[in-house]
A protein has these predicted regions:
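Enriched for short, Lys/Arg-rich terminal
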Residues: 26, 71-94
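Basic, Lys/Arg-enriched alpha-helical interface segments
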Residues: 1-65
Length: 94
């Protein structure tokens, strides 16, 4: 069963900031593009089997089924909702 993957405004801002930091601060637009591509591709793969990554082990997040997916040096925090078949990406952090 396929899930719809959505990003919160905060997660979208995180992606923009990751790109900006690598492209501007580290002066590597090519690496910024590559990192953004890897993050986006991996996030979109959450449409299948979103439960495959571990549950965040602290309350109140554990009881809300918050999950953590590593991508390179980043962590993608998301919540799958099985009732409506959605995955909501909350944040992307270094």
């Amino acid at each position: 069963m396929s899930y719809e993957v959505t990003l919160t405004p905060e997660a979208k801002r995180d992606l923009r900031e990751i790109y900006r930091y690598i492209a501007v601060e580290l002066q590597s637009e090519q690496n910024a593009n590559g990192q953004l591509d890897r993050l986006e591709e991996t996030i979109l793969k959450l449409d299948e089997m979103p439960e495959r990554f571990r549950v965040y082990d602290r309350e109140p997040w554990r009881s809300r089924n918050l999950r953590v997916m590593p991508v390179d040096n980043y962590l993608v925090f998301y919540i799958p909702d099985h009732q409506v078949k959605t995955v909501t990406v909350l944040r992307i952090m270094y």
